[in-house]
Amino acid sequence: MGSSRLAALLLPLLLIVIDLSDSAGIGFRHLPHWNTRCPLASHTDDSFTGSSAYIPCRTWWALFSTKPWCVRVWHCSRCLCQHLLSGGSGLQRGLFHLLVQKSKKSSTFKFYRRHKMPAPAQRKLLPRRHLSEKSHHISIPSPDISHKGLRSKRTQPSDPETWESLPRLDSQRHGGPEFSFDLLPEARAIRVTISSGPEVSVRLCHQWALECEELSSPYDVQKIVSGGHTVELPYEFLLPCLCIEASYLQEDTVRRKKCPFQSWPEAYGSDFWKSVHFTDYSQHTQMVMALTLRCPLKLEAALCQRHDWHTLCKDLPNATARESDGWYVLEKVDLHPQLCFKFSFGNSSHVECPHQTGSLTSWNVSMDTQAQQLILHFSSRMHATFSAAWSLPGLGQDTLVPPVYTVSQARGSSPVSLDLIIPFLRPGCCVLVWRSDVQFAWKHLLCPDVSYRHLGLLILALLALLTLLGVVLALTCRRPQSGPGPARPVLLLHAADSEAQRRLVGALAELLRAALGGGRDVIVDLWEGRHVARVGPLPWLWAARTRVAREQGTVLLLWSGADLRPVSGPDPRAAPLLALLHAAPRPLLLLAYFSRLCAKGDIPPPLRALPRYRLLRDLPRLLRALDARPFAEATSWGRLGARQRRQSRLELCSRLEREAARLADLG
């Protein structure tokens, strides 16, 4: 770029030309209309700031403009020179002095203006002045300077006198310290390796237009590293404007800066959106979101809606937000928690929904049904217009069935109460309700319950069902008006000594159980073979007799010709039977015999006094004696196929009787 003295001579001339051209309204297309920089000892390879010029300021220069403001360049041995010019849309009528003198501490001058914020949200920036041992920060509110503009920072070593023995390096011949870096995503740090040489100060910063801003605490570290060594610098978020800056510790040396993450897709991912601070100022019909970014990027924002929190946010047509100084505004919106901003930059996007959910709902709706009409009751804190339309199930929330019914109130006191009456379309349909005096509104889906209209029919059907159930229960569970309530068991005793006779006894027991019905139990040893084998015949017999006596049942003795010798004989098998006959009361004992297996003379004299029944001829009389009354017989035999089953059992007993008699004759 030539010698430093030639550059110093050309700089005032350039400023005068630009100043005169601005006074005359003449612009230069190839010259920046908002600033001219001559940063001393500053080197960068990042595209955020462009190339830098190395112009040392070593001569007194004072330029006085014909306008009410002027530009001055001070003589400095080692300083950062910066000149800001006014343009058609830039700085207006301002006097700016930027002088960085030789000091052990860095100085930063920041100029702000009050933001023109969208109504009704207002943001106030108060003048502040902060002085610390680390650096000087002076903030001056100005109505003419954008908050995106002036940022200048200079860092000096804590003790530059220790480096007086080192040779001064010319900024035009030296590009600053050489270093390399490695990204450590797991540790969220950057490892910086310094080339051989003197000690170097290394830090991470966020590159803006005129300044590489330091990271927020506790990541604003600046470490001193010896040549040939490495150091790890932690970062909070991996951002596209994250830079690595290194400089020697001596005064006014060239700083080398690398901003490698601008082209990394990872820098525009989740870390980028986590670093953005969203502030919601939405109210009434205006969606307002203010963003605080850590990188000088301009985002795009549009309105989207999501049906629930687990689905994607669907973009709405013609719903691009207006941006002004980091404020994104969308007018004529019916505020709802599921109407959200979708911010995007390149291929990366983020959905941010309104935070003030408690104060968003300015109206609500309830419904009532009357005859063939649906009545919608609207309650609103402001004057508004509401619409409703039917929606068929399965067609989606945005599908309407004409016509659309509308009600509004533009005048009167607040709050507003409105009623909208619409006729029923058909059962199963739902109605969509929304505010129609805005451009973007969330549609509420309401499904009326009209089941009560059929309540009378349901009650009649229920009564008929209950009546039928009562009749069935009465027919199946009715008991006789007289007599004991519980069913009385029947103990069937026999002395069958052949397989044919045992089959005959089993068939008779099955016939009795089916004929008695009503839950009557027939006790026979053939059906309890395991229990008899476990406890023994005699204990089982006495246990069964005790149960029959306790439940007021009946003992039926089935006699055969070979069962017992005359009682006067010394047959030991007669002892248990005689003991049972003496123990059991006489009304509980009945005697039955098959005519082919036993004659009247075969019955011992002690048993002839018992009621006797000849099978199968006296079976109906036996059933009556066993308390099988007509109602039991009717409920048992009156069912479908009961007579056929009874007849088949009678035929089985008759056949088994003939077979047993034939075998007895053969024996």
Curated annotation (Swiss-Prot):
Residues 24-454 are extracellular. Residues 1-23 form the signal peptide. GO terms for cellular component: cytoplasm; extracellular region; plasma membrane. Residues 487-624 form the SEFIR domain. Predominantly expressed in mucosal tissues with high levels in keratinocytes and colon epithelial cells. Very low expression in dermal fibroblasts. Expressed in various tumor cell lines. InterPro entries: IL-17_rcpt-like, IL-17_rcpt_C/E_N, SEFIR_dom. Gene3D superfamilies: 3.40.50.11530. Residues 126-174 are annotated as: Disordered. Keywords: Cell membrane, Cytoplasm, Glycoprotein, Inflammatory response, Membrane, Receptor, Secreted, Signal, Transmembrane, Transmembrane helix. Glycans are attached at residues 318, 347, 364. One of its GO terms (molecular function) is interleukin-17 receptor activity. It comes from the Eukaryota. One of its GO terms (biological process) is inflammatory response. The chain crosses the membrane at residues 455-475. The keyword Transmembrane applies. This is Interleukin-17 receptor E. It comes from Homo sapiens.
